[in-house]
A protein has these predicted regions:
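Conserved catalytic segment of ABC-fold P-loop ATPases
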Residues: 84-87, 100-102
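Short-chain dehydrogenase/reductase
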Residues: 34, 70, 88, 94, ...
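Flexible, glycine/small-residue-enriched loop-and-beta-strand segment within the central core
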Residues: 1-82, 108-118
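Short glycine-rich donor-binding/catalytic loop of glycosyltransferases
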Residues: 92-93, 98-100, 109-110, 116-117
């Protein structure tokens, strides 16, 4: 954790080794979430303009993860993303957009592959 003040964990949350939470903004996990090894959750957004970046300007966008979500190894979740309940996020995925509930998603960028029960 970068700060620890902006993290909310639901019941039965499990994170494997080397989980990184860059929590300048709120990161919320629902119940029964499984996080595989080497996953990263980042809320900080830095400007593309070099002068603003050099001046230390940044904003934070929250990350929200529903209940019953499983993250495979090495997933990166970017600022401002919401992941719905009952999702599976495949190993090595880079999640840059919201993922709807009850879906399996994977890739870089991460995209929905199918419904969970298909």
């Amino acid at each position: 954790c970068e700060y620890g003040d902006f993290i909310t964990l639901g019941n039965n949350f499990f994170a494997n080794y080397n989980c990184k939470l860059v929590d300048g903004g709120q990161i919320t996990f629902g119940d029964d979430v499984l996080v595989g090894p080497d996953c990263t959750f980042v809320t900080a957004v830095h400007p593309t303009d070099p002068e603003r970046r050099r001046a230390g300007y940044q904003v934070f966008k929250p990350i929200s993860v529903g209940s019953n979500v499983w993250f495979g190894t090495g997933v990166v979740v970017c600022p401002g993303v919401t992941i719905g309940d009952n999702c599976v996020i495949g190993a090595g995925s880079v999640v840059v957009k919201d993922i709807p509930a009850n879906t399996v998603a994977a890739g870089s960028p991460c995209r929905v592959i199918r419904k969970v029960n298909e």
